[in-house]
């Protein structure tokens, strides 16, 4: 209860089966899973695999073909690459969310110095999502803990740069970033 799926009997069963599978295969390292998030159908355009393939969104079917992902991908981190792929196969439907994204793109298009500064910091992060998943499953090695510290440290100047903007969408983005001060301090003490 409380995850917005109470009325979705089949969804609850599917989520339970997925958690059971993870528990069986990951040796009970699923305690980090604390929430269930539902992808709302009215927020995204839903496309089947046939449509995604025919539109060549992520992979080209031709010998010398180029997918839309290949054309657009100028990401500088694995996280950005995954996000762009997700955005292409699950495009937004809600006008406000689309406008927020466009406002961010417009801001960084007209403020190249700010964009360059963020790119440098994002490059320092590496694959923060992967590192976090390793922490959650207690499979992180010392070298990766050092990389985690670098990644979390890179969030601080990103928040500062975004907070200096007068763009509401950028300010909203800044408010969602957490440099995890307590975790960074704990890593420093190791």
Cite the ranges covered by each PLM segment.
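Short intracellular "coupling" helices and adjacent cytoplasmic loop segments at the cytosolic face
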Residues: 111-112
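Charged catalytic and DNA/RNA-contacting regions of genome-maintenance
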Residues: 1-107, 116, 120-123, 127-136, ...
């Amino acid at each position: 209860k409380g995850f917005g799926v109470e009325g979705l009997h089949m969804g609850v069963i599917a989520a339970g089966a997925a958690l059971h599978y993870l528990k069986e295969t990951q040796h009970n390292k699923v305690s980090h899973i604390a929430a269930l998030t539902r992808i709302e159908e009215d927020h995204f355009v839903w496309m089947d695999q046939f449509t995604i393939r025919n539109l060549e969104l992520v992979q080209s079917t031709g010998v010398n073909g180029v997918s839309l992902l290949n054309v657009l991908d100028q990401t500088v981190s694995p996280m950005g690459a995954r996000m762009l792929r997700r955005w292409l196969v699950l495009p937004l439907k809600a006008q406000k969310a689309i406008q927020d994204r466009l406002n961010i793109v417009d801001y960084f298009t007209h403020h190249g110095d700010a964009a360059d500064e963020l790119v440098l910091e994002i490059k320092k992060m590496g694959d923060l999502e992967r590192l976090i998943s390793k922490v959650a499953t207690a499979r992180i090695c010392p070298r990766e803990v050092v990389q985690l510290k670098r990644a979390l440290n890179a969030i601080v100047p990103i928040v500062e740069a975004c907070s200096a903007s007068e763009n509401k969408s950028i300010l909203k983005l800044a408010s969602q970033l957490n440099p995890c001060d307590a975790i960074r301090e704990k890593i420093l003490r190791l």
